[in-house]
Amino acid sequence: MKGVITMTNIEKFVDMVKNSDNIVFFGGAGVSTESGIPDFRSTDGLYNQHYKYPPETILSHSFFMDNTEEFYRFYRDKMLALDAQPNMAHIKLAELEKAGKLKAIVTQNIDGLHQKAGSKNVLE
């Protein structure tokens, strides 16, 4: 069946990682949601919740300039997760980097969890 993850597929993936020394990881919000960081576009994401203004408006430069207090209120309440800790994905990626297999992490995340897990070459 197409798209089904089987042990054979997982074993192939593990084998690819074991035999690779030039891995670049591309990631986004899904990596940090397990750590309690909200995403934007899922059913429960910030873009699907109801606010006085749409989140994409609140997070714009012009909104920040015109409504600084409202911007910071949204940012503090919805985007800061000061207690968030790296999850297994962050930790394993850091381990791959330390082992010399992972060369870089390219991410849209700005939560610092990759760095907190020990990754050094993170491009946000």
What are these regions (language model features)?
Residues 1-124:
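Conserved catalytic core of sirtuin-type NAD+-dependent deacylases
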